[in-house]
Amino acid sequence: LDGGHRAVGAGRCHSPASGGGAEEEGMAPPICWSVEVRGLSQSSSFIICSLQGIVKDMKSLTPHLLLCSFFTSIAPALGEGFRNKRVAFIPTAAAHEEYTAYVDSARSSWKELGSNITDVDIARMPLRTATEALEQAEIIYLSGGNSFYLLDCLRSTEIDQIIRGRLAEGAILVGESAGAIVCSPNIAYIQPMDRVPDNYSQADYTGLNLVDFFPVPHYLAPPFVKSSKEVVAQHASLPLELMNNAEAVIVEGPQRTKISSEHQ
């Protein structure tokens, strides 16, 4: 899956237009961030608003993972932990998609954060070169696209093991749409929303298993209104994490924080 609205074929979606009303006298419209924090023993929620769209309270968060539907909608709220960093940008999931504007959108958002970006196409780049780029990166970004193709590439190249090692060393993983889905224990659940390529080479759909929940990006967002409901209906027994195109989940050890941005 990729981050957005329009569909070109089954299991694909495309970048949403930025939400909100017209700007007035050069001032950005107010942005409300709804934040739900869930830990092992407590649950709380609160609302933070910022005219500039920068949530100061979020700047203290340095997560292991950030999983989202559409990175560009979340990027304005990210604090110093995401700014001026070396980013290994993995666009591989979108390699065979007809519409890839969401990849360019994410790349632009990273540049606005002052990132030093290195493109790492794990399906085409020599393994040694890709490994070196990942070892130097402070943040590893997995783009949207086809979840099954991305997982196949990650596992067949054993880049999944390299990513796991980098996270243990303190790197941050950001997964957008398909990039979020592959972090789950097993991605079979997402088939109503995404297609399995004919040349998928793995024996199963075991994911990276970096989180103990199952992200459902683009929940109730066109063109996935019906298919996202099907995922929920078919897998109600799983700990699903529903995210619309303005939501993300930040994972810090046993605690996960869900944030939501909406132009008001």
Regions found by a protein language model. Name each.
Residues 58-139, 143:
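N-terminal beta1-alpha1 cap of cysteine-dependent amidohydrolase-like domains
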Residues 152-153, 159-221:
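Class I SAM-dependent methyltransferase SAM-binding "motif I" and its flanking Rossmann-like core
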Residues 215-246:
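Conserved anion/nucleotide-ligand pocket segment
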Residues 239-264:
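A contiguous loop/helix-start segment that scaffolds small-molecule binding in enzyme catalytic cores
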